[in-house]
């Protein structure tokens, strides 16, 4: 039996600024000698300090996700604290890593791209693929927590990945090469996983269900189910994507750990209750991907509307869109079933 895997993720704009702390954490974890468990480490970085610490990262086989938005113009929103362009330094460091540790680079390094008004899916994909032989993971800007006075500026910057991809003259080639990194294949995979009668998660699925399956409202994670994120101030969050107002507790070396499971359950259930009625009538409840903690004003006293709510007509369009995609791409079904869902 393969040993269980634990995952430690270092996530912030530039985690390498706190390298002594990272070393301390890893030394502590390694001193535990945990039986039957392999601990792996991951990090997201903009590569600014990569030249100083790449030896250590390669030694520990860090899973490294490098934030890069394409060529120099594409990447121009990423600047230093003094406002200077960071592209040349970032690229030089990534090039050095690839040259110095080619095997590590091939196995453990990937790229993350944020789409905005200075790049396109086409440009980013080709730049990173041609230079590094990697497929970037392309995402849109996070829409939560935007200040009211910055909303217009944000709207001008925002680009939808699926819409942008469809505008490319090489659309068909891109989605075929991107595969699960493309919104189309990602949606089809979820559609088949949830609604195809030929997908079985375990042997228990082979037995006929006598009653309808119950689903937890929304598509978010139950706290501590998948990961845990601790801020620099010691606040415990369910993950790095949600606001700090949804803190689960506090970890501070100078005081006792403040982590009440009952309070966490009460808070989580309170927010679920605010959406429960909508979830009961939502046609996407079986395959919901909406994290409730990313819904604006979830923590307010006002009544909220889930942006992922889907009525009968919208669901019909969702089914039609996925079926149409598989009709136009006859190999999509077999490819997803064999490569991803098998």
Where are these regions (language model features)?
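Conserved acidic functional residues
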Residues: 69, 227, 235, 240
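Short acidic, Pro/Gly- and aromatic-enriched capping/linker segments at domain boundaries
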Residues: 223-224, 303
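Canonical radical SAM enzyme core domain
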Residues: 15-60, 64, 68-74, 81-89, ...
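Single conserved hydrophobic/aromatic residue that forms the stacking wall/gate
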Residues: 1-7, 11
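Flexible mid-to-C-terminal extensions adjoining Fe-S/redox cofactors in radical SAM and related proteins
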Residues: 235, 241-342
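Alpha-helix termini
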Residues: 5, 29-36, 97-106
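Radical SAM enzyme [4Fe-4S]-AdoMet core and its adjacent flexible, acidic
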Residues: 76-91, 95-219, 223, 229, ...
